Amino acid sequence: AAFATLMIPFDLLGGIVLPRRFARKTPRLPRLILSWLRAVLIQSACLTASLWIVLQAGQTIGIAGAIAAVLMIQIGLVATQKWLAILTGGISLESNVADIDAAGPRIATAHHMDSGFTGSIVGLPGAEEVVVPQSWQSRMTPEELDTQLVRRIGAIRTGSRTRGLLLALLVNTGTFGICAVLPNAGVTTVPQLATAALYFTFASFLWLLLLPRISREGVFEADRFAFDNGHSVRQIEATANQIESLHDDEPQRSRRLESIFHPVPCVRRRVAELSLRTRSIHGCWNAARMTLFLSWACGGFLSRAVHCNIGRPELWVILPTD
């Protein structure tokens, strides 16, 4: 409750003031308030339940039990991400009857209000579902939409999405384990666990600076998959530009700024990367932002307090990606 209250002015800035300043479509204020309250209540309930489970495991088994509980809760979050997005963000999903590849993952269309919603890949490995924003179907050409679907299917087939997921699980689980043994932290009392969660939040900020580079390699790998499967550089560039205009609208940025804060590289860098004949680096698709969502299991407070989703409940569970 204290954290939610502290975040109110920042949520107003990120969810209302800045989007309207840059002429982004936003719901009316009463609807925004109701959606924010619903999202805060659901996220708070998830965080509380997660920490309670970790506390019970810590009191019963010890630090190893608490770490195992954190890992299992994260796996549960991955499995239920779609449903949490529906409950928290208020989006609705419609499964597509005719997928572009019968042997590929299921594809669902998301009906949403936030212009920054990009959809993602949800579900456990082997049971993935590609979520596509409804706005893309009305504002992108069929060729651009097909290119983007092929990219996301490529993230699955190359293993990049699974690698990103495993990295996020490893980072959060390992970080929590370290934080739980720091001074005044622990897993057997509420004050100890609260201290561990605070340590974890500070550590998460450091990961925000380190993980984007690995995530960018996943973007490059998905672009390469689309190129190798018949989509030209021009098509991939046009698709990336269209998505950029719909969401971040930041086509040019310094390399230093991008290297720290942006897990999705700018279009210019993506096109330059495609000029390479082969790629030897395997990426971890969406690892940086998946780490934020999965931090719910560890009491992480940064999951809804980063520049891409602050004050925007539709983006708290499915954070923006490429």
PLM regions and their residue ranges:
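Loop-to-helix entry region at the N-terminal start of transmembrane alpha-helices
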Residues: T188-A197
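Hydrophobic alpha-helical transmembrane segments of polytopic membrane proteins
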Residues: A197, T201-R213
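Polar-ligand-bearing catalytic/cofactor-coordination segments
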Residues: A1-T188, L210-A297, F301-S303, N309-D322
